[in-house]
Amino acid sequence: MNTSRKNPIGIYEKALPKQSSWLEKLAIAKAAGFDFVEMSVDETDERLARLDWTMEQRLEIVAAIQKTGVRIPTMCLSGHRRFPFGSHDEKTRQMARELMLKAIKLAQDLGIRTIQLAGYDVYYEEQDAQTIARFEEGMKWISEIAAASQVMCAVEIMDTPFMNSITKWQALADKIRSPWFQVYPDVGNLTAWGNDVENELTKGIENIVAIHLKDTYAVTETCKGQFRDVPFGEGCVDFVELFKLLKRLNYRGTFLIEMWTEKADEPLVEIINARHWIEDKMRQAGWNNA
């Protein structure tokens, strides 16, 4: 990990060539100038299977981390979109807990410090008072398991109305009251919903463990918004003002550039260009990240 940056800059695993090994992924990230990689455990069978990796497979990744010097400090655990804590189905809720326990064990084995949680009570089902109550119960349970395991869990600000602001996360956190239950905002999602970004980040700064960087198209009366695959600079996020604000707030956490270029013709070129673009906006904001 490049500790020369005051705020390390990482790249999302799904921005890297999909068929590459973990040693290759970390080496590519290093060659592209990134400090770390965020692992994805999404709702696909392929990536959920990572939770059942053998010890030999886990040690291979640890060896790759040691060889390259590029860490995997965070995990994006979006598998709960398929198996949500708020589900009406008891078996689905039980699977949600099993996934969480396995994710925490994987994090411990690989040295992952923070698991980003999906802020969905349900995704493919109808929401009601019971789904919300069960989700809150699940988050309380997670906070207890996280505390005992010494693995930070942090909720993402999402692409649906249920958890689309830091204010909404704080209302939940006030009920849970755990230092192991924090927030991991996505500035693209936060902006797309028309939030007062300055107010949201200011009120949440003491609880922000990391930040996702991506651009989005805003949700309006005539547009449902777009929450992924929006080229930097074409969406609604004012990155210069964002970095000015975070500089004033003395944010010292990591930045994760979130992209989905794993099947692109030249993903290496795209992620390097994205990093250069972000760092240029940081410089325009007066941010010296050397």
Q: Which functions belong to the PLM regions below?
A:
Residues N2, L23-E24, Q66-T68, F83-V183, ...:
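Active-site acidic/histidine proton-transfer and metal-coordination neighborhood
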Residues S40-I65, G119-E126:
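Glycine-rich, proline-tolerant flexible connector loops at the mouths of alpha/beta enzymes
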Residues E38, T74, Q116, A154, ...:
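Conserved beta-strand positions in the central sheet of alpha/beta enzyme cores
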Residues T44-A49, R81-S87, D121-D128, A192-G194, ...:
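A short acidic, helix-capping loop that chelates divalent metal ions and anchors anionic groups
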Residues N2-Y12, T74-G86, G119-Y123, K224:
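N-terminal small/glycine-rich loop or linker at the start of catalytic domains
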Residues A15-P17, V41-E43, G79-R81, G119-Y123, ...:
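Active-site-proximal loop/turn and secondary-structure-junction residues that shape catalytic pockets
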Residues L48-D52, D89-R93, Q226-F232:
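Short glycine-enriched, charge-decorated loop/helix-capping segments at active-site entrances
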Residues M1-G10, Q19-D35, Q66, G111, ...:
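Histidine-acidic metal/acid-base catalytic patches
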